[in-house]
Amino acid sequence: MEKYQINNLASEIEETLIEIRRTIHKNPELGCEISKTRDLVCKYLDKWDIKYELIENQGIIAEIFGKKEENNEKMILLRADMDALCINEKTEIEYKSTIENRMHACGHDAHTSGMLGAGYILKKLENNFSGRVRLVFQPCEEDASGLNAQKLVDKGILLKDMNDSKSSNVDVAIAAHVFTKLKSEKIGINIGETTGVPGGFSIKVIGKQGHSSEPSKCIDSIMILNQIYSAIQGIQRSYIEPDRASVISITYMNAGDLDRWNIIPKEAEIKGNIRTQYESDNKKIGAVIGSIVKNICSIYGADYEYDYRMYIESVKNDKYISKIVSDAVSELDEEIAVKPPLFMGGDDFCKISELVPSCYFFVGIGKGENDYPIHSDKFELDENSILLISKIMSLAALKILDKN
């Protein structure tokens, strides 16, 4: 019965959700400065009579109370991220970004509209269940530090009673993410580590400046940094097991002066990103890079500055909760559940999944080999993903609330 009710309600709201998503896409906002997106979400929460409050950095907490006459203290948390990226959109879609250097290139517009749809469905079905569902609309997810999710946790979003620090936590948390490497309209759920672990590093080699005709009287920062760069390329082969995914990318280099080509510069700098499947590997790579920098600089008598940090942990899916969500997916359509490819992106939902049993599921939007990945200026999204998020979140929440 729930499946058919959810499908019917989803059909009612489909055009509205697509309109919401396109409005958000045309007006992307960065970080925690997302007042237009927040106001649009609140407009529909008001329209559908869903109670909510605003919290730090323009986040929104909405709650739906089941009215079925049973004593059920269970509470499910659903979460969607709302912020865009600092990217200049180069697609040709009619609803492309209207703001230069801002783009929804990670699907957060679909996550937001999809969870709004789940809110609509659950509100319409409030007489059919007991317990509570909390919707968390989160800004600033793209901040790699993960500090915003932690701030929301510190504000009490996981507490059943946010005004009582001694209150018990919500029972379950669920989030979704679109994925281009997963075929369109397929749903993927992993057990355990389900997102990558992002880390970052910066290296500055401090040598001795001098004339390019007398390199023996200098300490050549560029040459030293080049050796460090080359050594970094061998880390994965030498230190990480081949069945454990890892990626090291140099994303920034700087040295010298374009107008002073005859001077060996005192300083040279690179920055990079580390993505690993496991937290221990990220830390190991960070430590190995530090040793490489120290040893190579020591050989040539250079000073250095090295900074490494692991930004956030992997999102971890609870086995029991993921099975319930998988069952909900199969009930909606037994042919759409698949094992997802490895996802190396990070998500600060990890700050929630480390504290309460959680499920983070992937929604396929891939059309073929020529798909542009997330964070591309030509990224495009299959809007069928919106309704899938709505239906899976709402049915999974009802199934979990119904469990003893």
Predicted regions and their residues:
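Divalent metal-coordination and catalytic microenvironments
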Residues: I24, L78, H108, L135, ...
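Acidic/His- and Gly-rich active-site-bordering loop/insert found
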Residues: E2-H104, S113-S130
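Non-cysteine beta-strand/loop elements that form the S-adenosyl-L-methionine
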Residues: L77-R79, F201-I203, Y360-G366
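Histidine/acidic-residue-rich, glycine-tolerant segments that coordinate divalent metal ions
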Residues: L85, I93-M103, D109-A110, L116, ...
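Short, small-residue-enriched loops and turns at beta-alpha junctions
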Residues: N27-C32, L85, E142-D143, D257-D259, ...
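A structural signal for isolated positions on well-ordered beta-strands in alpha/beta enzyme cores
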Residues: E53, R134-V136, E305
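Metal-dependent amide/peptide-bond hydrolase catalytic core
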Residues: M223-N404
